[in-house]
């Protein structure tokens, strides 16, 4: 039981700390490296990861076009890389 309590406390400290970002996990684009954005997880919009910008032929979201974003990105997809645009291709949007 003591170990369980310690794990819970550790998880709470991690969840509410704003000073440290675990590698790959982010809150905003500014915390990610060049060529990436802070995209929402496909499973939970409360969890975000640094994800590479879209390359030619990769799926994109038409409303996700600015890096760094002014707020928290809601899409699980990053904008397209420099020089590419997000356009509709059949049923999906792709970087081209």
UniProtKB/Swiss-Prot annotation:
It is found in: Secreted. GO terms for molecular function: toxin activity. The keyword Glycoprotein does not apply. Disulfide bonds join 26-38, 32-50, 37-78, 60-86, 80-95. Keywords: Disulfide bond, G-protein coupled receptor impairing toxin, Secreted, Signal, Toxin. The keyword Disulfide bond applies. GO terms for biological process: endothelial cell proliferation. Residues 1-19 form the signal peptide. Belongs to the AVIT (prokineticin) family. This is Prokineticin Bm8-f. It comes from Bombina maxima.
């Amino acid at each position: 039981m003591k170990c369980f309590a310690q794990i819970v406390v550790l998880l709470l400290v991690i969840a509410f700390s704003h000073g440290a970002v675990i590698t790959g996990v982010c809150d905003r684009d500014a915390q990610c490296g060049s060529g990436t954005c802070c995209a929402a997880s496909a499973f939970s919009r409360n969890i975000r990861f640094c994800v590479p910008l879209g390359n030619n032929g990769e799926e994109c979201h038409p409303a996700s076009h600015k890096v760094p974003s002014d707020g928290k990105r809601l899409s699980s997809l990053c904008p397209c890389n420099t020089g590419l645009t997000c356009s509709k291709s059949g049923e999906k949007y792709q970087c081209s």
